């Protein structure tokens, strides 16, 4: 019997030719894929190189807006004295939220610093026989002019800021005149110093911020004057008072360090807020010292100059 005439042999022959054809087709497809991929790489390489040059070439004119935000929580110890409410000192925990936004442009020395602060404190006197609750919202706007040294690692920003404060102190023990309103506006020279360095392989940013009010205006009842007389009877008695560094010596400062943690930047440090005034025969001071911790984010917007 002729093996070439066998049906089984014919099936094997057809399968062999089909396998060879399939293999050849795969080889051709892979060859075409290599050619197409190579062509794409050749076409895209100049474009990618041009884009890299566009964003990395320092000679190209750019106008980048840089925004740095910090959201912090502060836990402090507060001491409050308001002789309109009580001659006693009250102390207790203070919790505050601080939101800071710094806006600047690359290549320019002017920058803006906007700060929102809200805090509340629960206080007791030394005998434990009386309580006070104090709260305050503050909005600060600062305009600074910057200097830098050591290849931009050391920076100093100096200028001034406007501070607005609205708050209260409530004495739970008083039946007559139980609360005191705190409303004032300050003009203060301010400064921010920062230094970039490394601890081993960890990049760190040490930052110090300070402001000292020089001039301002504040609301205050006069000695022995009730709020009923002011607002119900309309008896004005020098209740809007001009202040200076002599009558209202105050200081606000913050010393922090920024460091990377996982994929975030953490800010940790000390916060001190000293507010004092002696007007209309009344003395007030609020001393707050504590720890702040929060997150820092930095955003950069790139706009090509025409």
Where are these regions (language model features)?
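Transmembrane beta-strands of outer-membrane beta-barrel pores
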Residues: 74-81, 118-124, 162-170, 210-218, ...
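Residues that define the transmembrane beta-barrel architecture of outer-membrane proteins
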Residues: 89-97, 131-139, 154, 179-189, ...
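Short loop/turn motifs that connect adjacent beta-strands in outer-membrane beta-barrel proteins
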Residues: 59-67, 102-113, 146-156, 198-206, ...
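Outer-membrane beta-barrel transmembrane domain signature
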Residues: 176-263
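Residues on the lipid-exposed face of transmembrane beta-strands in outer-membrane beta-barrel proteins
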Residues: 75, 95-105, 139-147, 160, ...
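Extracellular loop and loop/strand-boundary signature of outer-membrane beta-barrel proteins
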Residues: 81-89, 123-132, 174-180, 239-243, ...
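Outer-membrane beta-barrel "beta-signal"
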Residues: 287-306
